[in-house]
UniProtKB/Swiss-Prot annotation:
The name this protein goes by in its record: Adenine phosphoribosyltransferase
Enzyme class: transferase
Lineage start: Bacteria, Pseudomonadati, Pseudomonadota, Gammaproteobacteria, Pseudomonadales
Gene name of this polypeptide: apt
Organism: Stutzerimonas stutzeri (Pseudomonas stutzeri)
Alphabetical keyword list: Cytoplasm, Glycosyltransferase, Purine salvage, Transferase
Subcellular location: Cytoplasm
Gene Ontology MF terms in the entry: adenine binding; adenine phosphoribosyltransferase activity; AMP binding
Record's catalysed reaction(s): AMP + diphosphate = 5-phospho-alpha-D-ribose 1-diphosphate + adenine
BP terms from Gene Ontology: adenine salvage; AMP salvage; purine ribonucleoside salvage
Subunit annotation: Homodimer.
UniProt record similarity statement: Belongs to the purine/pyrimidine phosphoribosyltransferase family.
Pathway: Purine metabolism; AMP biosynthesis via salvage pathway; AMP from adenine: step 1/1
Keyword NADP: no
């Protein structure tokens, strides 16, 4: 299936003033209501990574789980979940980070990765980069490597992709929105 950025962008709903005034939230739930759009997103990412040399998919809580699990299944890679604080039942490593909304913690099971593993990080969106940067710090603390950070959407004006690239993490997104896009 050929990727159609226009079709994908029309299914990403802008929600004004959510979760707080002044923020335009990019809601991807309409993508999941369209089997064609979901297949287009998944197939585009699978084509990009089908021959890539990494060992794990690292999916970020919560919307990153949706497509990350499809990628792990289709690419036959183990799926590592990066969860919000307090959601994992066993021993964890934790990393504080800032978001466009405030401060939070990201956690991973302490036995999820081994030294030398290579991880494709996946989230729905790159905004300030806080969540992906925290995931990258956790991966590096486990002496594993980051293959790339990928997402459906980039908000380049918020600088997250650039921050990731500045610390040597390549990024890939299927589409981007300017903050002024409605």
């Amino acid at each position: 299936m050929i990727f159609d950025e226009f079709s994908i962008k029309t299914l990403i709903r802008p929600v004004q003033d959510f979760p707080r005034p002044g923020v335009v939230f990019r809601d991807i739930t309409p993508l999941f209501q369209s089997p064609k759009a979901l297949r287009m997103v998944a197939d585009s990412l699978i084509q990009r990574y089908v021959e890539a040399d990494f060992t794990h998919i690292g999916a970020l809580d919560a919307r990153g789980f949706l497509v990350g699990s499809i990628l792990a299944y289709e690419l036959n890679k183990p799926l590592v979940l990066f969860r919000k604080q307090g959601k994992l039942p066993a021993d964890v490593l934790s990393q504080a980070y800032s978001t466009e909304y405030g401060e939070a913690h990201l956690e991973i099971h302490a036995d999820s990765l081994c030294e030398g593993d290579s991880v494709l990080l996946f989230d729905d969106l790159i905004a300030t980069g806080g969540t992906l940067l925290a995931a990258a710090q956790l991966v590096r603390r486990m002496r594993a490597n980051i293959h790339e950070a990928a997402a459906i959407i980039d908000l380049p004006e918020l600088g997250g992709s650039q921050k990731l690239q500045d610390i040597g993490i390549p990024t890939f997104t299927l589409t981007a929105f300017a903050l002024s896009d409605r």
